[in-house]
């Protein structure tokens, strides 16, 4: 399945999947690879993301089931998985759409910056595997 997915994206879109470490920070690693060509910048991406969410509490808190301050504190910790809330924040803070490919040549999900006029920037493209891992 994984090899077929990689071949499909290469053949139909010209994309190559770059594998990132599966250590709980894979989403942030994949974004760091897309933004900085360095997955080791994942800690900086995480920090910027959580700072942005904290500054925009009123916007993000309704999408978080637990106490928002506790959520942000927990998500700041290395190894905590990122999710759709963090992807939306990253899209907004970098003013770039984020396309998520999951075993298809077309994105399964796309996150857009809040100000749609800013989504002219090149998308961040991530692949999602086995319901728990992101690659670049």
Where are these predicted regions, by residue range?
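Structured beta-strand/turn binding interfaces of compact recognition modules in eukaryotic regulators
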Residues: 20-23, 29, 55, 63, ...
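Interface signal in eukaryotic adaptor modules for cytoskeleton, membrane trafficking
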Residues: 38-82
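Second-shell loop/turn segments in exported
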Residues: 16-17, 34-36, 75-76
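Non-catalytic, low-structured ubiquitin/UBL-interacting segments
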Residues: 1-19
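Surface-exposed beta-strand-to-loop junctions
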Residues: 5-11, 24-30, 63-72
């Amino acid at each position: 399945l994984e090899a077929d997915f990689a071949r499909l994206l290469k053949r139909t879109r010209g994309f190559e999947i770059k594998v990132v470490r599966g250590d709980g920070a894979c989403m942030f690693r994949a974004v760091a690879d897309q933004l900085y060509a360095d997955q080791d910048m994942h800690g900086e991406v995480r920090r910027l993301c959580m700072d942005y969410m904290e500054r925009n509490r009123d916007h993000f808190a309704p999408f978080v089931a637990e106490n928002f301050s506790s959520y942000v504190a927990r998500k700041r910790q290395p190894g905590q998985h990122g999710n759709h809330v963090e992807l939306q924040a990253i899209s907004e803070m970098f003013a770039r759409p984020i396309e998520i490919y999951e075993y298809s040549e077309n994105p399964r999900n796309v996150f857009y910056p809040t100000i749609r006029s800013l989504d002219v920037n090149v998308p961040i493209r991530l692949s999602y595997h086995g319901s728990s891992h992101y690659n670049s």
